[in-house]
């Protein structure tokens, strides 16, 4: 395994960085051509793959950008590229390059990324409740996992109701209730189960979290290098250096497992063990790393207009969406008990 970025991955990362260094908005990503990168060439995109989307989302996270990028490119485009037919891709991905938003309804009350969703799909009708659905009101299409199918529906379809719910980072998130929503045969992803969609979702969330932790580490290291107490930079104090080292270790280990998961999925290898570790490591190690970064910023960390707030709050939201460390440890332990 060689996780050094390829020329194409580095080019994608450079494009994202060049855009976000000027403006971290969704509009900037659209105008800069970032949203077109994973879209098939026949639809006006660049046709990059999972490796490159992972690099893209890591850079979005590194810059602390709170946008529909994860929902659209990670939770929407990535599974559709792998699991949808060409005709379905042509319909669902047509507007992405120009800023169209996609999302996925995967979580349910009390269940994070369930492989056996309670949402039912019977007789062409979809019924159930989904939580933590990002940017649903803006979305053109929504990927939905059900008990025996994975389907794509419009958030404005008859029978869909949405209620906005609060998030730590202020992004749009909704509870979606579906009551007998009609789904045409052409909107069903053939022979696709929730398990595979959840694997891809965890992988792209991990790539985004990788960037968030790395970005917070860089921000904090720069801050303590320039902030002085007793006439010396904070970074020269042994305690500060030791705490930064803890964040560095968390960042590097998350980076390793996130890249390993992307690699294994892209190469069609079994990624189950790595996904289990990724889910647990992000939920158990990223929040404490954010707490250390927040602490080392002192009073500056309390300023919601300062970038540290975006990193910390987004990690809190991701941890919640993944079910938290206890849930992830239970899943990892259950997998280990089978081997």
From Swiss-Prot:
Its EC number is 1.3.99.-. Disulfide bonds: none annotated. Pathway: Steroid metabolism; cholesterol degradation. Its cofactor is FAD. InterPro entries: Acyl-CoA_Oxase/DH_mid-dom_sf (IPR046373), AcylCo_DH-like_C (IPR036250), AcylCo_DH/oxidase_C (IPR009075), AcylCoA_DH/ox_N (IPR013786), AcylCoA_DH/ox_N_sf (IPR037069), AcylCoA_DH/oxidase_NM_dom_sf (IPR009100). Optimum pH is above 8. No activity is observed under pH 6. Pfam families: Acyl-CoA_dh_1 (PF00441), Acyl-CoA_dh_N (PF02771). Gene3D superfamilies: Acyl-CoA dehydrogenase/oxidase, N-terminal domain (1.10.540.10), Butyryl-CoA Dehydrogenase, subunit A, domain 2 (2.40.110.10), Butyryl-CoA Dehydrogenase, subunit A, domain 3 (1.20.140.10). One of its GO terms (molecular function) is FAD binding. Involved in the third cycle of side chain dehydrogenation in the beta-oxidation of cholesterol catabolism. May play an important role for the initial macrophage invasion, possibly in response to the acidification of phagosome. It contributes partly to the virulence by increasing the efficiency of beta-oxidation. Catalyzes the dehydrogenation of 2'-propanoyl-CoA ester side chains of 3-oxo-4-pregnene-20-carboxyl-CoA (3-OPC-CoA) to yield 3-oxo-4,17-pregnadiene-20-carboxyl-CoA (3-OPDC-CoA). Heterotetramer composed of FadE28 and FadE29. This is Acyl-CoA dehydrogenase FadE28. It comes from Mycobacterium tuberculosis (strain ATCC 25618 / H37Rv).
């Amino acid at each position: 395994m060689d996780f050094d970025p390829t020329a194409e991955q580095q080019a994608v990362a450079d494009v994202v960085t060049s855009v976000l260094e000027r403006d971290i908005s969704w509009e900037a990503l659209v105008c800069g051509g970032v949203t077109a990168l994973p879209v098939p060439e026949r639809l006006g995109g660049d046709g990059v793959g999972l490796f490159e989307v992972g690099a893209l989302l890591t850079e979005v996270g590194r810059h602390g950008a709170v946008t529909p990028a994860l929902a659209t490119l990670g939770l929407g485009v990535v599974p559709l590229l792998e699991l949808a037919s060409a005709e379905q891709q042509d319909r669902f991905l047509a507007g992405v390059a120009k800023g169209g938003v996609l999302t996925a309804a995967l979580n349910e009350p009390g269940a994070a990324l369930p492989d056996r969703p309670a949402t039912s799909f019977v007789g062409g009708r979809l019924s159930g409740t989904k939580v933590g659905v990002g940017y649903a009101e803006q979305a053109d299409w929504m990927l939905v996992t059900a008990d025996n199918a994975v389907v794509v529906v419009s958030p404005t379809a008859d029978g869909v109701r949405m209620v906005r719910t609060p998030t730590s980072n202020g992004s749009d998130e909704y509870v979606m209730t579906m009551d007998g929503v009609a789904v045409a045969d052409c909107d069903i992803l053939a022979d696709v189960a929730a398990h595979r969609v959840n694997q891809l979702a965890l992988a792209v969330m991990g790539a985004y979290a990788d960037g968030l932790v790395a970005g917070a580490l860089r921000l904090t290291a720069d801050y303590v290098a320039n902030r002085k107490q007793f006439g010396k930079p904070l970074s020269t104090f042994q305690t500060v250096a030791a705490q930064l080292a803890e964040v560095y270790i968390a960042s590097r280990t998350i980076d390793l497992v996130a890249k390993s998961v992307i690699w294994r999925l892209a190469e069609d290898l079994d990624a189950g063990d790595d996904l289990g570790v990724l889910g647990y490591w992000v939920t158990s190690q990223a929040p404490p790393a954010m707490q250390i970064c927040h602490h080392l910023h002192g009073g500056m960390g309390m300023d919601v207009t300062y970038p540290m707030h975006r990193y910390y709050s987004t990690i809190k939201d991701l941890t919640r969406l993944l079910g938290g460390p206890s849930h992830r440890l239970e899943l990892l332990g259950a997998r280990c008990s089978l081997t």
